[in-house]
Amino acid sequence: MIVRNLEECRKTERFVEAENGNWDSTRLVLADDNVGFSFNITRIHPGTETHIHYKHHFEAVFCYEGEGEVETLADGKIHPIKAGDMYLLDQHDEHLLRGKEKGMTVACVFNPALTGREVHREDGSYAPVD
């Protein structure tokens, strides 16, 4: 069994901040835990917009605090997100993620699992898993 504390992990290398300041993420479960997925708690900062296109990963996201929105670029549809909502990027959907005035905190599951140091590349993706 693995037990980790969010606040303790935020003081370690498991805490990752976006270079542009749009978000921070605490990676609680990673590829080296050998369970086939990763689990993160991510804070989307207020008033930000992040281009994301996970070409090599699937992601499920559950918002448990705050508000934001996801705009799918293929069709321009805007999906408001609030506490209690989830969305699943099951088609490698290219999208814009926006934090509203208070931002939002989300729980994210990735498959394949993240290694822990990923940051979004220029095209919005994470590098493929080796």
UniProtKB/Swiss-Prot annotation:
Transmembrane segments: none annotated. Pathway: Amine and polyamine biosynthesis; ectoine biosynthesis; L-ectoine from L-aspartate 4-semialdehyde: step 3/3. It catalyses: (2S)-4-acetamido-2-aminobutanoate = L-ectoine + H2O. SUPFAM superfamilies: RmlC-like cupins. GO terms for biological process: ectoine biosynthetic process. Keywords: Lyase. Its EC number is 4.2.1.108. CDD domains: cupin_EctC. Gene3D superfamilies: Jelly Rolls. One of its GO terms (molecular function) is ectoine synthase activity. It is an enzyme of class 4 (lyase). InterPro entries: Ectoine_synth, RmlC-like_jellyroll, RmlC_Cupin_sf. Belongs to the ectoine synthase family. Catalyzes the circularization of gamma-N-acetyl-alpha,gamma-diaminobutyric acid (ADABA) to ectoine (1,4,5,6-tetrahydro-2-methyl-4-pyrimidine carboxylic acid), which is an excellent osmoprotectant. NCBIfam families: PRK13290.1 (NF009806). This is L-ectoine synthase. It comes from Chromohalobacter salexigens (strain ATCC BAA-138 / DSM 3043 / CIP 106854 / NCIMB 13768 / 1H11).
